[in-house]
Amino acid sequence: MITRGEQWGVPTTRTHADIVVNGDRDLASRPKDIRLIVKAGDIAHSLGDPVNPLIGAECIEVPIDALRVNISLRDGSSVSLLASSHVMIGHWLRGRFICVNNSGFIGKRNISPRAHPNDGFFDVMSLQPSMRLQQRVLARH
């Protein structure tokens, strides 16, 4: 977990064993015991969209939190999701909407500016069905 003012991550060198992943879904689907290089997606964006290091190049290895979300459905069944960046339930513009977020970003939108992918916390945004469209648009930006 990060602490204000402390260095986050450790200097390392890219090896042949490191695997490049192309986004948040790809990142979440990989085993946790291998080193991954995130090339795109919301996690990469929250890390400043780093350049893919060449084999043998120096880089920083950073741990990130993972989200495991269990969703209970109306029919009594449940769904379990593993994600690296966010899980969204519902629709931004109508009805109830819940977003559990790790990176702070959804695309180019920084919906949780204080989020950090290794702070041990997940940011939650909840929009109630009674919210008007204008309020939802403001919450989205």
PLM feature segments, named:
Residues 114-117, 130:
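Folded interaction domains in cell-surface recognition and envelope-stress signaling
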Residues 118-120, 137:
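Alpha-helix boundary/interfacial micro-motifs
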Residues 107-109, 134-135:
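Short helix/loop capping segments that flank catalytic or ligand/cofactor-binding pockets
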Residues 1-105, 111, 118:
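Catalytic core of DAGKc-family lipid kinases
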Residues 92, 126-141:
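ATP/nucleoside-binding phosphotransfer catalytic cores, i.e., glycine-rich phosphate-binding loops
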